[in-house]
Amino acid sequence: MSNPEKIFYPFIKSHNKDNWAGYVSPRMGFFNMDIPDVSFGTGFLVGNRYGVMDLPHVHDGAYNFFIFTGADLDNIFDAPFEAEFFLGENGQELEQYNINKPTFVIAPPGVYHSPIYFKKVYKGFNSMIQYSGHESRRIYSDVDENGEEVERVAKSNVTPCIKDPSKLCTFCGLCFTDANETEQDAIDKMAPIHAKVVNTEKFKKYVYELKKDYHNLGDAIMNPRLSFKGREELDEAEYQFSFNIITKPCKLGDDEPVSNGQVAEFLWFSGTDVTDSWGTFDAEIEVMVGDDPDNMKPVTFSEPGVIAIPPGMWRGPITVKRADKPICFMPWYPHTKPRYKITRKMVDGKPVLVYDDETTITNPTAGDELFMQIKR
């Protein structure tokens, strides 16, 4: 079987936000480096007080996806917070969106976005930011001495440091966060942004309040859960995900191994308090994986992390052996490819692959049609 150490990835305690006043550190995150051609990386970037994150900027060749929630994921629909987010055709005309419920936001290539204004933070404000594309630089909007808009390019380890121009920028946070900042300081900092607000609602479709999903997965998972089904709910959304809060030992999925075919799968396990993601995780979990249904082996872990299933790998049940504290389990599918759920059946004494859901196949190949005929 493939190396289990390349299947489970414990979250690394990232200290790159230690200097960012108003943010929880260490930060929990995962960035795929081992599954080719799958752009996926995210983490909990958690604000623990009022503040302003970033300035209006754009990525010409990339999408940004944002998920906003409160601090307590086991109370995800009622965890309180108030934030403002901005989208615009340029950096000088911005639409303002007030967010106080779990929300998914898309910033397509070429669309200016930010700042995120942490307006009211009662315990913590969680922003999960995903980046999908081939352009890592940021382009900021400035105004020159003649009042004309000009664009300024910034990129980590390329742009000079504002505090010390002899060094390169590392986005350490020292130039745009201040431990002594007051709530009024944050309000004053937002005044120039609010002066740019227009009421065009051109980008309203990219701000989507996440819905309650009532499931039949059993009483071990809180009901309702939060889920997002990709383009079925929001055009241009590349991601599918759900927040499943597990409260007791259980088994998820069938004993029979399945494969998602050409689709990678990321299974995220963490604590439910984003201000203490490690301290609120106390569980033991086993996931069966293998290169084929005859060679399945367990991957067992007792710390927060991600199970990364490459395309073509088989997965069996997810068994929560111990859950002394609630667990946040998030399956992620970071692309728009159809998920062909494949199982193996014995037909006339021979093993064949069978699609369990033919409706996902809109343009069947000859091989697809063969498998569907076998199933029928």
Show where each model-derived region lies.
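A short beta-loop-beta micro-motif enriched in histidine and acidic residues
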Residues: 50-65, 73-81, 250-266, 274-283
